[in-house]
């Protein structure tokens, strides 16, 4: 199923060069948009710095788990197994879970679970960005769909745990 879904999403050899460039932009640079917007917003609205702290703590947790998974269980990338077409230069590191998916979905879930009403338009924008980043990683041949889904799941769990245990921060530091 993972391979079948990958082949449905993955770009073919004759794919439009313009579409490939768009996907490369999404895969490598679009992830910076929510980070930049969040940074700018927090400079002008210091009251939301707590969101950035929650995101950073969630990222620390989920990236640690991701590091452990990637070093304990090697999952070859599609191009390593000669499946589909690869349009993005990448090391032959383990692909599970996708660090790009982990990073971008941690931002999205942090907003949705903590500040959806205050950041409604930003929540929607970051979701569109997350979907484009994740799609592009599969489209360009560097990730399996399962890599993306596991990254999303780990991000959600991380953000949920930080939200649940946030009160401990106030007990210790306030």
Please place each PLM-identified region on the residue numbering.
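Transmembrane alpha-helix boundary/anchor motif
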Residues: 17, 47, 64-68, 156-161
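Perimembrane helix-loop-helix junctions
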Residues: 39-47, 141
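Alpha-helical transmembrane spans of integral membrane proteins, capturing the lipid-embedded, hydrophobic core
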Residues: 29, 33, 55-67, 152, ...
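Membrane-interface loops
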Residues: 46-115, 173
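N-terminal transmembrane-helix/juxtamembrane module of multi-pass inner/ER membrane proteins
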Residues: 1-32, 66-93
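Membrane-helix interface segments
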Residues: 16-18, 47-52, 117-122
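Membrane-embedded catalytic cores of phosphoryl/pyrophosphoryl-handling enzymes
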Residues: 88-174
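N-terminal signal-anchor/start-transfer transmembrane helix
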Residues: 30-42
């Amino acid at each position: 199923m993972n391979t079948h879904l990958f082949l449905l999403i993955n770009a073919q050899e004759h794919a439009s060069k313009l579409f490939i460039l768009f996907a490369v932009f999404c895969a490598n640079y679009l992830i910076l948009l929510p980070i930049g917007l969040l940074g700018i917003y927090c400079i002008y609205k210091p009251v939301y710095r707590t969101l950035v702290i929650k995101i950073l703590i969630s990222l620390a947790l989920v990236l640690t788990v991701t590091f452990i998974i990637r070093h304990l269980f090697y999952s070859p990338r599609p191009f390593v197994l000669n499946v589909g077409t690869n349009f993005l230069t990448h090391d032959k590191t383990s692909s599970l879970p996708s660090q790009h998916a982990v990073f971008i979905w941690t931002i999205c879930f942090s907003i949705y679970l903590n500040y959806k009403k205050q950041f409604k338009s930003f929540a929607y924008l970051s979701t569109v960005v997350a979907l484009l980043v994740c799609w592009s990683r599969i489209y360009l041949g560097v990730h399996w769909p399962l890599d993306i889904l596991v990254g999303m799941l780990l991000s959600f769990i991380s953000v949920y745990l930080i939200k649940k245990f946030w009160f401990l921060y106030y007990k210790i530091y306030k």
